[in-house]
UniProtKB/Swiss-Prot annotation:
Family classification: Belongs to the TRAFAC class translation factor GTPase superfamily. Classic translation factor GTPase family. IF-2 subfamily.
Record's compositionally biased regions (Gly residues): 168-185, 339-409
Biased composition (Pro residues): 77-98, 106-116, 305-328
Domain of life: Bacteria
Lineage, top ranks: Bacteria, Bacillati, Actinomycetota, Actinomycetes, Kineosporiales
Region named Disordered: 31-425
Record region (G3): 596-599
GO molecular function term, any single one: GTP binding
Segments of this protein annotated with the region G5: 686-688
Protein source organism: Kineococcus radiotolerans (strain ATCC BAA-149 / DSM 14245 / SRS30216)
Keyword terms, alphabetized: Cytoplasm, GTP-binding, Initiation factor, Nucleotide-binding, Protein biosynthesis
Protein name stated in the entry: Translation initiation factor IF-2
Length: 1044
């Protein structure tokens, strides 16, 4: 599913990209540029910010609707002047479509086609047309966009070919080509479609002037309008020949173009005279040539009087308009012109109105161009371009003059910086420098929400910074990381605090909510939309919790009349089991769903998971043991999940059982029995003898009816949670799921955790196949691609593709979070110590188990083993199922040990592991696995030595020897003095000599190995001679310290 980019949103909202970028920044969503992608949840929030803009941008302005009055505007009588439209610089526009549509409401008062009559009074509809936004080119029904050849309203003669338009620019609409055939073939007249003039309109058949009238119109100017005032969107024609054209049949003999020998007006932007030569007299008021200066008070072309009109070539003559343009003739940087009216663009026969920049219109608008003639711009009141003709640009392939006197619209010139670019440059200059790099800082309150396992690249994108700069800053803060490495929350907090940002790591629940929102799945909205009519009663979900060996599974076995304890290794539960039993209550058979959780301390996560999905918790406490540590922990889980608790006092048949003691102990934890005035139900049961079971089930149903609203919508796609998962050799991945709402059917496309697929089969707790599972029904699901983790949510997707995409995104999130969690933060000090002390010892493990919950519990228990920082424990792979050859290959490559929990390898795999020397350990009880791994970790520790004092000797006399130096005559006060042991000299309690060695030890004249307390001896300390009487010589040795 393609993501939407910022500029696409800006186009949809009808605003500029920088407005959308600024809005995203205000919303706390920092994006780098207009080409950055935006997530669907952010798009929805953004659309709330632009409710009207988005709607206006998607509809064309009503001012440009073509109406049935189109033939009426074709009469070249008095009409309103060209109305300037708000330019749309980023969109190519056909030449001046907006004025053509805007001038529709002005009816022509005279049916005679007299273009010489100026329009003195413009129509009152002009101001609204100026305020109308310029619509997109595809939505402009301007006449210039319609080819003239197939127009049905115009009675064109037969044999009139439609020449394809010459591509001159993005704003050029289709123009009719030259008409080589037939006398009287009309060119584009004032008001005809395809003309570049702003008032051009398609005439109706009844309003069209006869061809015989054309020779009488001697008041038309000869030649082209200057190019300096043309809108930038007009096409540029290169060096098409612009000389005299042969006469047209029906016209008085091909009159030559006046001024043909002179240079083409508009050719030189630096010439003193621009535009068309005057036909008669002086310009009014002696003003400069119109079209020369965009800032002049007078714009547009005065209408010269007299002179024959040049005509295109007849049949058999040279191709009118010159050769077809090619890319070499095009200007270097064509820019998009103003759609609508340029400066002074006037309708034929009407005075030109001013364009942008405050310039007023000229004395009169020009005529539309002829087919086959040179194309003129739509601005400046001159003659509009001739469709199909050559450009009015300079000759000699020297490029156009556009931009020489300012730009009528379009993108800024290369090198000119936008306001946004200047602002970013200013912010970069003002940004404080950390470690030699400048990064934009926050104000200390700016909140950045970052997903789990994000990298520095993600962080840099949020604050619009360079990832390399963040790597440098992090290095100066004492942390080493790459730009794409997944980092933990502490590292981001450190970096955010330095840069002035408040870092918030998105919780897994929020990540899941945003992920599903990208696929238009909102679970919260589904729950809110459900009414009372949609809900139906469902069975209660009851979790059995308590301390290990207090009889939880035995109690469930007694309720279900089965024997699960015998199947569990070591007699302790190491999986979550889900069952459903039916109890008759008040004459109605009511099902109850039971979830059995382990009680060992290693299964804390399982108990917490069981408490989250339950409605009622049964706290099992042995009457002989009382309240134990895991009892308190299970109680805290249930209270944290805010579920009602029913206490089952088990083993009341044992000798020494005291149920009242249990009631008293639980009072300290806010569980007050009903007989003591509380609201908690206590039931005395004996799982071994089967007593009190009915009372327990009745207590569960009474609690459910009294304090819970157990209803769910079963008429929708299933939603729920995966309680347990395992890999079956014949069935593949098998997930035990609990449906919380909706109904799960065989054949549904399901996604559970990182696994997805279609439900191939569903089995109940007895192994029987079921076709559907209603709310509160636990079933085993077959057909997933991988084993889901215990506690993963599952849902039914609309199709397989959506399920696969959700699973892949979940997998990526979990992988990044796991990488961030497994990353060992290496500071510069740690790195230096590692270099000095050598390689850090690491124990690599590969965990394989029979269930996802068991593997998770084993991994958590192993990571809790604390043996110091010198040894590192790494779990490089974990999985559900038997040990495979791939596991052995990974163990060979990484020097790892494989731990199998309730699994065994194939014979071939075992032989392969023996050949490769891979150590595989198998365990069926979690205690043994934890103890062995802890012993292995301690074996990797380097030995620690501690100082053990051997004895002390007091110096009584000093003997000086030239051969041995000073020798101390001493009396052993305590312990013993041993030859070659370490020694130090103490003088009045202060160490004067340390790290010495007793090199000689004699008893009288005999060498001695050791001298005990109460004996005298002579001690030589080698080269150390600073000895005095009453000094104390203390001896010690370094002994290895046991690691524990």
């Amino acid at each position: 599913m393609a993501k939407v980019r910022v500029y696409e949103l800006a186009k949809e909202f009808g605003v500029e990209s920088k407005v959308v970028l600024a809005t995203l920044k205000e919303m706390g969503e920092f994006v780098r540029s207009a080409s950055s992608t935006v997530e669907p949840p952010v798009i929805r929030r953004l659309k709330d910010k632009f409710p009207t803009e988005g709607g206006a941008a998607s509809r064309p302005a009503p001012a440009v609707k073509p109406g049935p009055r189109l033939p009426q505007g074709a009469r070249p009588g008095p009409a309103p002047a060209a109305r300037p439209q708000a330019p749309a610089p980023a969109q190519p526009a056909p030449p001046q479509p907006a004025p053509a549509a805007a001038s529709t409401p002005a009816p022509a008062p005279a049916p005679a086609p007299r273009p010489a009559e100026p329009a003195a009074n413009p129509a009152p509809a002009a101001p609204p047309a100026f305020q109308a936004p310029a619509p997109a080119p595809a939505e402009r029904p301007a006449a210039a966009q319609r080819p003239a050849a197939p127009a049905p309203q115009r009675p064109a003669p037969a044999g009139r070919p439609s020449t394809p338009p010459v591509s001159g620019g993005p704003g050029q609409g289709p123009r009719p080509g030259a008409r080589p055939g037939g006398p009287g073939a009309p060119g584009a007249r004032p008001g005809a479609p395809g003309a570049g003039g702003p008032g051009a309109r398609r005439p109706g058949p009844g309003d069209r002037p006869e061809r015989s009238e054309r020779p009488d119109r001697g008041d038309r100017p000869q030649g082209d309008r200057p190019r300096s005032d043309r809108p930038q969107g007009e096409r540029q024609q290169g060096d098409r020949p612009q000389g005299d054209r042969p006469g047209r049949p029906g016209a008085p003999g091909g009159a030559p173009r006046p001024g043909a020998g002179a240079p083409r007006p508009g050719n030189n932007p630096f010439a003193p005279s621009q535009g068309m030569p005057r036909s008669q007299g002086d310009r009014p008021g002696g003003a400069p040539r119109p079209g020369n200066n965009p800032f002049a008070s007078n714009q547009g072309m005065p209408r010269p009087q007299g002179g024959p009109r040049p005509t295109p070539a007849g049949p058999g003559g040279p191709r009118p308009g010159g050769p077809r343009p090619n890319p070499g003739m095009m200007p270097a940087r064509p820019t998009v012109g103003r759609p609508g009216a340029g400066p002074g663009a006037g309708r034929p026969g009407a005075p030109g109105r001013g364009g942008p920049g405050g310039a007023r219109g000229g004395a009169g608008g020009g005529f539309a161009g002829r087919p086959g003639g040179p194309s003129a711009g739509g601005g400046g009141g001159g003659f509009a371009g001739r469709p199909g003709g050559g450009g009015g640009g300079p000759r000699g392939n020297r490029g156009g003059t556009q931009g020489a006197f300012g730009r009528a619209g379009g993108r800024p010139v290369r090198g000119r910086k936008s306001k946004r670019a200047k602002r970013q440059e200013y912010e970069a200059m003002q940004a404080p420098a950390v470690g030699g790099v400048s990064v934009r800082h926050g104000d200390g309150t700016t909140v950045l929400r970052i997903r789990r396992g994000a990298s520095l690249s993600d962080f840099a994108e949020r604050i619009d910074a360079d990832p390399a700069a963040l790597v440098t800053i992090l290095f100066h803060l004492g942390e080493m990381a790459t730009a794409t490495q997944s980092l933990d929350e502490d590292t981001f907090q450190l970096l955010g605090g330095e840069l002035g940002y408040v870092i918030e790591v998105v919780s897994p629940e929020d990540e899941e909510r945003e992920l599903l929102a990208g696929f238009s799945i909102d679970l919260d909205a589904e729950l809110e939309a459900e009414g009372d009519d949609d809900l139906s009663a469902r069975p209660p979900v009851v979790t059995v919790m308590g301390h290990v060996d207090h009889g939880k599974t035995k109690l469930l076995d007694a309720i279900r009349s089965s024997d699960v304890v015998a199947k569990e290794a070591g007699g302790i539960t190491q999986h979550i089991g889900a069952y459903q039993v039916v109890k008759e209550h008040e004459g109605i058979e009511r099902p109850i769903t039971f979830i059995d959780t382990p009680g060992h301390e290693a299964f804390t996560a399982m108990r917490a998971r069981g408490a989250k999905v339950t409605d009622i918790a049964i706290l099992v406490v042995a009457a002989d043991d009382g309240v134990m540590p895991q009892t308190i922990e299970a109680l805290n889980h249930a209270q944290a999940a805010d579920v009602p608790i029913v206490v089952a006092v088990n083993k009341v048949d044992k000798e020494g059982a005291n149920p009242d003691k249990v009631r008293q102990q639980l009072t300290e934890y806010n569980l007050v029995a009903e007989e003591y005035g509380g609201d908690t139900m206590f039931v005395d049961v004996s799982a071994r003898q089967g007593t009190g079971l009915d009372s327990l089930l009745e207590a569960v149903l009474l609690t459910a009816d009294a304090s819970l609203d157990l209803r769910a919508n079963s008429d929708k796609d299933a939603r729920g949670i995966a309680i347990e998962g395992n890999l079956d050799k014949g069935r593949g991945p098998v997930a035990t799921v609990l449906v919380q709402s909706g109904t799960l059917h065989v054949g549904d496309a399901i996604v559970a955790g990182t696994g997805y697929g279609r439900v191939r089969a569903m089995l109940d707790e007895n192994g029987d196949a079921v076709q559907e599972a209603t709310p509160s029904r636990p079933v085993q699901v077959l057909g997933l691609t991988s084993v889901p983790g215990a506690g993963d949510t599952f849902l039914v997707a609309p199709d397989d593709r959506t399920a696969r995409q959700i699973a892949e995104k979940r997998e990526a999130q979990e992988r990044n979070a796991a990488l961030a969690k497994a990353r060992k933060r290496i500071t510069l000090e740690d790195f230096t110590k590692a270099l000095q002390q050598g390689k850090v010892e690491t124990l690599n493990l590969i965990l394989k188990g029979d269930g996802a919950g068991s593997v998770e519990a084993l991994e958590d228990a192993l990571f809790k083993i604390d043996v110091g920082d010198e040894v590192e424990l790494r779990v490089i792979d974990r999985g559900v199922g038997a040990v495979t050859k791939n596991n052995v290959n990974l163990a060979v490559a990484s020097n790892a040990i494989i731990i199998g929990f309730n699994v065994r390898p194939e014979q071939q795999t075992k032989e392969y592991a023996d050949r490769e020397g891979v150590d595989i350990r198998f365990y069926s009880v979690i205690y043994a696995a934890i103890e062995d791994v802890e012993a292995s970790l301690k074996g990797l520790l380097k030995p620690e030595f501690e100082e053990v004092q051997l004895g002390t000797a007091e110096v009584r006399e000093i003997f000086r020897s030239s051969k041995f130096g000073n020798i101390a005559g001493t009396l052993v006060r305590s312990g013993l003095i041993r030859r070659n042991s370490k020694a130090r000299v103490l003088r009045r309690g202060v160490v004067h000599g340390d790290n010495l060695t007793i090199e000689s030890l004699r008893r009288f004249k005999d060498d001695a190995t050791e001298v005990r307390e109460g004996y005298e001896c002579g001690i030589g300390l080698g080269s150390y001679n600073d000895l005095q009487v009453d000094d104390v010589i203390e001896t010690y040795e370094m002994q290895e310290k046991p690691r524990g």
